Every structure is written in structure tokens, then in C-alpha cells.
Amino acid sequence: MTWITPKKAIMLAAAAEGGTKLNAFDNALLKMGIGNVNLVKLSSVIPAHIEWLDELPKNIPIGMLLPTVYAHIESDEPGSTISAALGVGISEGNEGGLIYEYAGYCKREEAEDMVRKMVEEGFKVRGWKLKEFKVVSAEITVKEKPAAAVAAVIMFPY
């Protein structure tokens, strides 16, 4: 297998219910348009000069391996609010960046605040200058069915 440094990326988030916690997770992936691919979990470094997409590319082959950073949480506890967030920091000159993920029993705003703090610290310890911060998040309150919140950065080699 040959790995290629990704050239494009997109930020996505969704929340969904399902018959089980795993089905809720799958349903959230389907809502995001990535339920029929294989997500390959990455750590959190963004390649230099990556292009950010506003929508998913068309005709992604079923089963395609897609490099992904994602946060997820599932719960079947009625009344619980769960959230997942990803924070993306882009460096000056777009020479690279960082992605941090968080998921927990909390409101969306708390998850977003957490990833912002993590991005800022990640840049500080590297001595990088933060030019731009982006965030994507999902929140859901569990009702009668299990629920999931998922946030992801999907990277594409083309």
C-alpha cells in the first residue's frame, strides 16, 4: 500500500440516534456522508498547504480508505447531553497545522472551548503562530434511543 500526503480536507459533524450505540455512531457517519467508507484514524498534524473543502467530493468509492481525525461519543442514558468537537489550527503561511479532538458528557460550547485550548497549547509548545482557528461540533440529548455525536476531519489524497 502506498500512502500519499493528503491535499484536501473537510470538517464534518453530526449527531444521530440508533437502535444501539454502534448504530447511532453509524447513523451519524451516514448523516455526514462518510458511512460507506473506511476511516483510518490519524493523529493530529495537518500537512502544509492543504485545501479546505466546503462539501464532500462526489462519487467516493464504497470502502475507500480515508485518513481521518475524529472524536465520537455514544450514550444510552436518557437525559444525558453528549458532544463531540474538533478544533483545527492553521499556521502562518499555511505551513501546516494541528487538529485536536474532544468528546464528552457536555454541551457543544464546552467541547468547542476545550479543543480551542488544546490547539492554542499545541501551537505554543511548537513555537508556531496561529493564523486561523476552525471548529466543528455536534451535540445531542439522549431520549429513548441510544445516541451518538461525531466530529471529523476527513483528508483526501486528490
From Swiss-Prot:
Coiled coil location: none
Transmembrane helix among keywords: no
Entry note: cofactor: Binds 1 pyruvoyl group covalently per subunit.
Enzyme type, top EC level: lyase
Gene Ontology terms: biological process: arginine catabolic process
Residue numbers bearing the Pyruvic acid (Ser) modification: S44
Catalytic activity, EC: 4.1.1.19
Keywords attached to this entry: Decarboxylase, Lyase, Pyruvate
One Pfam family this sequence matches: PvlArgDC
GO molecular function, one term: arginine decarboxylase activity
Family membership: Belongs to the PdaD family.
UniProt protein name: Pyruvoyl-dependent arginine decarboxylase
Originating gene: pdaD
